[in-house]
């Protein structure tokens, strides 16, 4: 065990020496990456339920402000979802669906409206059709919820990379 620790020590010191640091390093809630996220206002998102889910996930992940007067940045997101049957039986009934959620986002300065960064993220999941229509509906909603959280997490990572480089 001691030999393993001694072998890892030079690697850790080398990474520290070259300026490596984790993107979302936490020193409590005072970490710089966490503080900048708190200044982002997430605009309401169209798209019915999934837009609501994406916005709430973004607010939770970013711990963003819900007040436009204290925000430094505005995040606007547009979502598009598609559902297509991927497993079709010989009698033309569908037994599995593919759910695709795409989001295009734009981060802008709240004061002058200048676009700072923008991008697109996509996530794909699937769900089965079962005998119970209610169970199938719940599976679809679960795919939407998981997709919304995944999209929000991907956007958070993109924004973290942007702020790490343009701080």
Predicted regions and their residues:
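C-terminal motif of bacterial Sec signal peptides marking the signal peptidase cleavage site
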Residues: 14-17
